[in-house]
Amino acid sequence: MVPAPGSRAFPSPVFLGGVFFVFFFRWRGNYKVQQVRLRQYWEFTLWETAPNTKQKNDFFAKTLTYIKLALWPQLKKQSNQRNQRRGPPGERRILTPLRGACQLICSLLMKTETLSVPRILT
């Protein structure tokens, strides 16, 4: 049986056009975002499936170096005698969110045992 022309048994062409319009133009608008996400997903897949090569280990070693240099910068030279007599300051640095995130990343990188990361600056 075929539904009558005025019945609601089948979605109207206006409704179908609206659905097409919304989905098509949302897809067109997000085209650049989709390209970036696809590239990131592809790079992540390649990185995860790659064997532990020298390039991979060098990347992790450099990342650890930069994180540690950001976490523990060199102490500035003391300018006056009073501060020199007092001695270098202890571990009283304020934990900012960025420093906390760096410490978390650093600890996670140190705990990964699947990658042969050279333990530098430990």
Curated annotation (Swiss-Prot):
Keywords: Cytoplasm, Membrane, Nucleus, Transmembrane, Transmembrane helix
UniProt subcellular location: Cytoplasm; Nucleus; Membrane
Recorded superkingdom: Eukaryota
Keyword Membrane: yes
Main location: cytoplasm
TM ranges: 9-25
An example Gene Ontology CC term for this record: nucleus
Topology versus the membrane: Single-pass membrane protein
Record's protein name: Uncharacterized protein YBR090C
Organism name: Saccharomyces cerevisiae (strain ATCC 204508 / S288c)
